[in-house]
Amino acid sequence: MAKKISKAKNKSFSIGFVGTGRMGANMARNLKEKGFTVSTVFDTKQNIAKKIAKEIGCTASKTLKEVTSSSDVVITVVTDDKSMLNIYKKKGDSLLIDAKNTTFINCATISPDTHIKIEKRAEAVGAKSLEGCMASSIDQARNGTLYLMCGGKRSVFNKVKPILDAL
């Protein structure tokens, strides 16, 4: 049985999603239903982002900078190391623009080395990063019963624990 989450507590976060395929979209739906504020979604396939944005009542960002600018917490659900490094690139459109005080929860299937690079890049701009490796499927993403293996600083984990509990 999924843990009951207090909706009042959930309003303190403004959450953005990068990667709204089957996993990311279902994670966004789940958080929205549990009372979290999902402010924006982004996908390289804009039609997919627009569809989920309309469904859950948020914005479909056209740039990664827009996601960071409108979110306290950004959850990334992309496919591989190359995609992850691309969304956190040092130049051009990137989640690192205006990222000071943003917390990133990276749920992508990527190598440990890439997680370390991303954490260093985030910290360099005043942001925080948490690794949130998933060992579950689409149904668990939708139902809020994901198995997440988290890595990162305890203070970052504690800050976003209500989100992690809901996922």
Residue ranges and their predicted role:
Residues V18, T63, D93, A135-I138:
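Short beta-strand/turn micro-motifs at beta-sheet edges
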